[in-house]
């Protein structure tokens, strides 16, 4: 989680690290804040959303503090390397970005409300960086789990682009792609709920200050 002065470039599938057929570490069984399992299968009626908005430590906290979120876990997504490690993701040779899987109850919090939180919690115009964190692993992304999620994500991007442009910001660089074919690989145990275990730890994400005109803003302090 530091400034890297090299120009980031996504690897091709041929250039990417091969990875391994099984993970080298075990994911904790329960969320340290919410108390629910990190890994599915999840209870009926819950939905899954995947977001990438910079350093996943601070990003995960944004979502677990949201009412209606049942569990969260951080991992690597959008690239080519199977079962990557954190060091491999940071090398820029996996193609993955740091992502947060959000399992939520749509009867309590809508996907559109999560999209609003996503857009307002980072600067989606920065390409392969987020603040001082530079690298392909910090790129902004939404990986959708249904046609309805894809339509909502696309509509929210268009709506947010209008207000960003009016405020003098650049074009959104967020990639919106289906989660199918882009597996979510859970990160190491020490990354899970990192800012709960380390309350004074690093949090490099920050928004543009521009409100996204969809959903309902979370309560103060979230």
Swiss-Prot record:
Pfam families: PMSR. GO terms for molecular function: L-methionine-(S)-S-oxide reductase activity; peptide-methionine (S)-S-oxide reductase activity. The active site is at 55. Its EC number is 1.8.4.11. It comes from the Bacteria. It catalyses: L-methionyl-[protein] + [thioredoxin]-disulfide + H2O = L-methionyl-(S)-S-oxide-[protein] + [thioredoxin]-dithiol; [thioredoxin]-disulfide + L-methionine + H2O = L-methionine (S)-S-oxide + [thioredoxin]-dithiol. GO terms for cellular component: cytoplasm. This is Peptide methionine sulfoxide reductase MsrA. It comes from Streptomyces griseus subsp. griseus (strain JCM 4626 / CBS 651.72 / NBRC 13350 / KCC S-0626 / ISP 5235).
């Amino acid at each position: 989680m530091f400034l890297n002065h090299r120009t980031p470039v996504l690897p091709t599938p041929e250039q990417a690290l091969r990875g391994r057929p099984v993970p080298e570490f075990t994911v904790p069984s329960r969320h340290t804040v919410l108390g629910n399992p990190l890994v599915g299968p999840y209870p009926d009626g819950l939905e899954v959303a995947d977001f990438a908005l910079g350093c996943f430590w601070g990003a995960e906290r944004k979502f677990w503090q949201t009412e209606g979120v049942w569990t969260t876990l951080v991992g690597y997504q959008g690239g080519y390397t199977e079962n990557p490690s954190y060091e491999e993701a940071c090398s820029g040779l996996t193609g993955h970005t740091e992502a947060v899987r959000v399992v939520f109850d749509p009867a309590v919090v809508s996907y559109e409300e999560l999209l609003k939180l996503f857009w307002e919690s980072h600067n989606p115009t920065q390409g392969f960086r987020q603040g001082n964190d530079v690298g392909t692993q910090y790129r902004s992304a939404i990986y959708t789990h249904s046609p309805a999620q894809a339509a909502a994500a696309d509509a929210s991007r268009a709506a947010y682009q209008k207000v960003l442009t009016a405020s003098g910001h650049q074009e959104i660089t967020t990639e919106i792609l289906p989660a199918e074919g882009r597996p979510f690989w859970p990160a190491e145990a020490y990354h899970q709920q990192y800012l709960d275990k380390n309350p004074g730890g690093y949090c490099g994400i920050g928004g543009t200050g521009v409100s996204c005109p969809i959903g309902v803003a979370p309560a103060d302090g979230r």
